Structures are given as structure tokens and as C-alpha cells.
């Protein structure tokens, strides 16, 4: 019998579901610590087409948590590195990459009606809000990542509606901004862990702390939610 790379997945999901995933197209906005692992989980599960969106360059400080960050990839475009990796996982994958940050001024680049699912793994509130509004306007399912920085407990993540979240500072801001814009619901993954205060030396740049095992957990939870949603028979 010919070997199939998705045969173990088919044992769990069923052959029809694996075939269904191969016909789906997902767009992942932001491919850093969270988004990179979303892509990894989706492609290894058998998603047939993926769009990846990010303007960032791999930096040395990314190595502690980002899938695509290695000494050999520092200085390269994240979407270029990720494209090569994902094509090496599934040679039949259809992949489209965009070297831009998603913001109101770049949003017209994308036709959201082409997507079966959208992932918000963006860092900025402005970008997140714009992406959510565009996906909602197009009637496309979207799942949004809340804060993964300043956290140590990968088991504290929960899948919820944005208006049922608590603790997470980013979720609090998003609730307020989405309510202003009339967004009634949004599927998110957020942490119930109280944020840890980073330990800065005087004069250091103020950025969130991060660790190797938290952003990947968030990304893989999101990938799992998407796969489960997409294989449900309509």
C-alpha cells in the first residue's frame, strides 16, 4: 500500500475529513511566536492552501520562541523562511506570501472572500481590529490570539468568546474597541494567567517577556480549533 503522509491523521479524523482539509484555504496574519506554530499545525494536519502575512525579519531575540528563528535564518524575511519550511512539510501545499504588515492602509490588498478561515496573530491592536472587521464583513470565520507575552503557564489558555474573557490586558482592550464598533462576538484564545512583570535593567527597551513553551501552545491551540471547525459537516 502506498504510504500517505496524512494516514495517521485520517485514523483520527477520517479520510473524508482529511480530504476536506486539503480543499481549504486559511490566511494567517502574523507568523511570529504564535502564528508560526499556527501554520505548522495547520499544514501538518493537511490544510491544502495557506496565505502567510508578515513584514518582519528574523531577529536574534526571536530564537527563544519562534519556530522559524535559527542562527541560520537571522536577517531573513519571516515569510520566506516559513514558506520554505511549509513546502518541505507538504510538497503539494499551495502557499501565498505577503511581505507586509496588516493595517488599514494595506487591508485592500486582500480579498477575504477567498478564505475559509482567518487567523489573527497580529501584535498591534490597530491591525487586529481592522482584520477582525474585514473578516466579519466578508462573513469569514476568524479566530484571534490574545496576549502570550509575560506568561509562564501554557496550560492557562482557554478558547472563549471575547466578551467572556478575563485577566488578559489585551483582551480587555479588544473587548472595549470591538464593542464600540458593534462586533457582537469573536472566537479567541486567551490566558487566565496573571501577567508577570518583566525584569528590566535600567535603560533597557520595554518589551514583553517571553519563553519557549508559551506562544507555541497558543498557536497549536488555534490550529486545532481551526481544523475542528473546518471538518464539521455543514
Regions found by a protein language model. Name each.
Residues 34-35:
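Hydrophobic/small residue at the entry helix of a nucleotide-binding pocket
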Residues 43-49, 137-139:
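Conserved S-adenosyl-L-methionine
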Residues 47, 52-89:
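Glycine-rich phosphate-binding loop and adjoining beta1-alpha1-beta2 segment
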Residues 99-107:
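Conserved SAM/SAH-binding loop
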